[in-house]
Amino acid sequence: MNHSDTLSLSLELLQQPSVTPIDHTCQTIMADRLAKVGFHIEPMRFGDVDNLWARRGTEGPVFCFAGHTDVVPTGRLDAWNSDPFAPEIRDGKLYGRGSADMKTALAAMVVASERFVAKHPNHKGSIAFLITSDEEGPAVNGTVKVIETLEKRNEKITWCLVGEPSSTHKLGDIVKNGRRGSLNAVLKVQGKQGHVAYPHLARNPIHEASPALAELCQTVWDNGNEYFPATSFQISNIHAGTGATNVIPGALEVTFNFRYSTEVTAEQLKQRVHEILDKHGLQYEIVWNLSGLPFLTPVGELVNAAQTAILNVTGTETELSTSGGTSDGRFIAPTGAQVLELGVLNATIHQINEHVDVHDLDPLTDIYEQILENLLA
């Protein structure tokens, strides 16, 4: 079976067990290909994380492909139909950890760039790659550190295409032109431990906090807007008690998350939470962690270039969306760059038997190449 350039490179990347934060030579494989077509290669290692900044050209505007070589753990190996790091093609589908999220997109980016440079050796501006091995993990020493380095030397990205798996039913049907913000909190409510038979001598933090938690769950934080759904509040963990049936717990710990729109700020959400907790007279402390600001790329050069390319290659009228979790786009957008996410179908990401349709890989490459044509030819 003759494999296309994109499929061959995908297979090579998928053989690397690059579980966060281990890159396992994926970036070297990509860098070697890019160096051959004139990219300046700059590895950036921070802590235990490998990052790659590769650039062809010295002038603006700068078009940047962004993505990650790391993958999530496999889960139970005996639940997979084949070795997750020995990629297999079965019934037209390519199986392997990272096949959808997002090594096939990385391969498509490299091949698209090779083809574009061959046709346009003196293209306008610059093409760049920003690749990390820590997107699925803490994301502390990855993209954010590369962006900080670029900012210090005033190296600006004009347009950024992140290869996250954005498609839902068919290739290119959804492009992410923004993401909601993500605000996490750990709430600790203090009570007084005691015997369940003597509740008057204790204070049950579960009982005291329950009305406040119910109110938080029922609160309408905003109604969203044309780009973003309404802000969502979700409790992810609750813990209290010693495990004994006859002890009133002395404290309650609750972890919750906001996925929020541009209609509110993180500070406004914090203030409203404190108002509700204070109204219920709780003795509490709360630790906040803002893991991502919301961002939005309005219709403009990058959106138009992507929509035109998708329509030309697949015949699909693409839809703009801001749904889903956070991505590394949240670190790139604050620099002023236009950011889009466009990749393969996301139906099996992080799952056992993760896979992607082989017949989507060459069209994705064509889309990426045509976006380059639309912006830099």
Curated annotation (Swiss-Prot):
Please state the Enzyme Commission number of this protein: 3.5.1.18
CDD domains found in the cross-reference section? M20_DapE_proteobac
A molecular-function term among this protein's GO annotations: succinyl-diaminopimelate desuccinylase activity
Q: What cofactors does the UniProt entry give for this protein?
A: Zn(2+); Co(2+)
Active-site annotation = D70, E135 (proton acceptor)
Q: What class of enzyme is it?
A: hydrolase
Q: How is the cofactor bound?
A: Binds 2 Zn(2+) or Co(2+) ions per subunit.
Pathway assigned to this chain's UniProt record:
Amino-acid biosynthesis; L-lysine biosynthesis via DAP pathway; LL-2,6-diaminopimelate from (S)-tetrahydrodipicolinate (succinylase route): step 3/3
| Binding-site positions, Zn(2+) 2 | D101, E136, H350
> What are the protein's UniProt keywords?
Amino-acid biosynthesis, Cobalt, Diaminopimelate biosynthesis, Hydrolase, Lysine biosynthesis, Metal-binding, Zinc
The family database entries (Pfam families) matched by this protein are listed as: M20_dimer, Peptidase_M20
Q: What Gene3D superfamilies would the database entry show?
A: Zn peptidases (3.40.630.10)
Catalysed reaction, written as an equation? N-succinyl-(2S,6S)-2,6-diaminopimelate + H2O = (2S,6S)-2,6-diaminopimelate + succinate
Annotated GO biological process? diaminopimelate biosynthetic process; L-arginine biosynthetic process; lysine biosynthetic process via diaminopimelate
Family affiliation: Belongs to the peptidase M20A family. DapE subfamily.
On subunit structure and binding partners, the annotation says: Homodimer.
UniProt-recorded name of the protein: Succinyl-diaminopimelate desuccinylase
Organism per entry: Acinetobacter baumannii (strain AB307-0294)
